[in-house]
Amino acid sequence: MKTLPLLICASLLGSVTLASSVQAAPAAQIAKGDVASRVQALNALLAEQWQHTLQNSPEFATILGDLRYNDRWSDLSLAHAAAERKTTADFLKRFEAIDTSGFSDTDKLNQQLMVRQLKDSLKSYDLKLNEMPLDQMSGVHIALAGFVSSIPFNNTKEYDDYLTRLRAVPKAFDQVIGVARKGMADKMMPPKYLLEKVVTQIDSIEKPAGMDSVFAEPLKHFPKTVAAADQKRLHDEILKAIDEDVRPAYRKLGEFVAREYAPQGRTQPGIWALPNGDAIYRFDVEQMTTTDKTPAQIHALGLSEVKRIEGEMTRIAKSQGFADLASFRASLKSNPATHATSREDILNRYRGFLAQMQPELPKLFGILPKTKVVVMPVEAFREKSAAAAEYHQGTPDGSRPGQIFVNTGDFANRSVLTIESTAYHEGIPGHHLQISIAQTLPKLPPFRQQAGYTAYIEGWA
């Protein structure tokens, strides 16, 4: 599973840097220009839209190593989301106005993919998917805490930027509560049983104080570039912000979820239970697969694949002397040799398989990632709800490695049988290889380097 520990929110204003002249030119003028000028107009508009994305998704910018907005959170308010819809519609109009006749296949594809991305953003807003900001896997409360591992802490300014962000957490969470209340009014609610897990998660993040907080991790290892006097100041001010800004904000959010939000959660887990649930399901399938297959077709394909794979597994089970697949699974589950002996045992197995695969890569691939990959334990606050493992991308320049977060909780009941395949899936030659190479391909515009088409990404891995 590939995830991004961030809050990507849209913006009020686009950048006025690279494409100001294009913005001023009438759409008809752009459409009628010669091929070279129209390609130039497309590239300038792509650059403008990319700057817009970074400016208005500061967490995303930080993850990519662009630190211009490293001291702020995305604007999570309803007003901002509404304004961003207008901005997105304007971008769409301008991209569609560019005549791509005579363009190279690459330039045509750049325009087509951007148009698709913008249309998807508009559909998502119109289906009110932004009105469910809290869930147990990628809710805002989890995203902020998990984001700490993606922030650089190389100098005093980066620590001061972090301090500014911590002090702004109460405002961000107030915006989240406003969005959640709008979702309550519109019946756009996550399942109740999952929201009850959110309450537990928030509590586990809020309770640890001072240096025990996940937000205090950067204070445990100051780089030599931060002077001793600044270390003392930052240590004291960051701890104060954690205890006086961050933790009270989490406490307030937790009380809201427990008292107001979770009780209103939907009783049916399926997305079809939402208003326009069928339309949302169709949109999700279309967006994640980039095909025109219906949900029913995708479901039928899934059932067919499960039947095929279980047939192969049953044949293997019988070849090992078992009557059926169920008895084979029961035997594996009860065998102590198939379970981890400690948290470190799980981490070491992942690291061992990745090290084993590394020298094999040149035999299979011509281009290899320059960015390294590291294995880290999932943070304690999300162990109970996290997947077995997940990948967080590194920076394009390799200054921060790709990270495989491994769930080591309840280790005695975790099977080691899937660790090898999962290590390859999340790391190399899976997510880390594909994403690290993609985000450094020189001939692609940044939005394509960072594109996240689920069926492709998961299919590759």
Model-based region annotation:
Residues 1-23:
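Gram-negative bacterial Sec-dependent N-terminal signal peptides
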